[in-house]
């Protein structure tokens, strides 16, 4: 709620600490509007406060990586305005490539076309989905869970090729729903590619939250990737 944001912001404002608030994409939640309203209310009383509210245009695990990039810049001692500028610059690089257990949750939530939803339910296909710039896009299908995970890896490869990604340039993690053992198996499938192309030896695994699980169902699995904020090469 607006009051939740006011309560979170005020101690920092009173201490003279500038704030960067990174909100889930507006396509999935009204939290950014609440944060913006709270900021405007506070600025009426504290006009010198520095509060920047950013629409992450991403969510779940990838939003977490984005916040960690902001923390990285803070810990490196970047100046506030430069931090905000850099965070806005890397935002467009964020992608989530994932698959889900079945298409019904996306269909009922209005996140995917009804025709594809009916076909998907009838054929028991596993949809492949990309999230970018606050929207989800159908990116293909597979006939089994294992093949759908392999295709997620192929989507990641294509993205890395398109971006001419260099080792150390991107932050990366796996996101999953309820099945942690499957997430560990997926990590094994990914480890050679991620080590070679991204220079990452230990792949982090994170469970997605309920806000996104409502749309994906209990068994999404995929990857999140975003450019490192301190990458200057």
Show which residues each predicted segment covers.
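Glycine-rich oxoanion-binding loops at beta->alpha junctions
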Residues: 1-12
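Short acidic/histidine-rich motifs immediately flanking catalytic phosphotransfer sites
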Residues: 15-18
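Mixed-charge interfacial surface used for oligomerization/domain docking
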Residues: 20, 27, 31, 35-40, ...
């Amino acid at each position: 709620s607006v009051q939740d944001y006011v309560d979170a912001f005020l101690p920092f404002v009173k201490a003279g600490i500038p704030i960067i608030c990174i909100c889930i994409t507006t396509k999935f939640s009204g939290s950014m509007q609440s944060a913006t309203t709270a900021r405007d209310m506070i600025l009426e009383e504290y006009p010198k406060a520095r509060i920047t509210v950013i629409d992450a245009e991403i969510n779940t695990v990838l939003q977490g990586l984005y916040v960690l990039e902001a923390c990285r810049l803070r810990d490196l001692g970047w100046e506030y305005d430069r931090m905000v500028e850099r965070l806005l610059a890397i935002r467009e690089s964020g992608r989530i490539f994932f698959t889900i257990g079945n298409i019904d949750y996306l269909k009922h939530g209005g996140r995917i076309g009804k025709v594809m939803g009916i076909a998907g339910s009838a054929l028991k296909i596993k949809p492949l989905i990309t999230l970018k710039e606050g929207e989800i896009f159908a990116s293909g299908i597979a006939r089994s869970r294992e093949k759908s995970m392999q295709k997620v890896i192929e989507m990641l490869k294509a993205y890395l090729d398109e971006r001419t990604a260099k080792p150390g340039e991107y932050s990366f993690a796996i996101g999953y729903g309820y099945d942690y053992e499957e997430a560990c198996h997926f990590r094994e499938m990914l480890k050679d590619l991620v080590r070679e192309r991204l220079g990452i030896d230990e792949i982090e695994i994170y469970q997605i939250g309920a806000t996104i699980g409502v749309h994906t169902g209990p068994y999404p699995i995929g990857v999140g990737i975003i450019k490192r904020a301190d990458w200057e090469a």
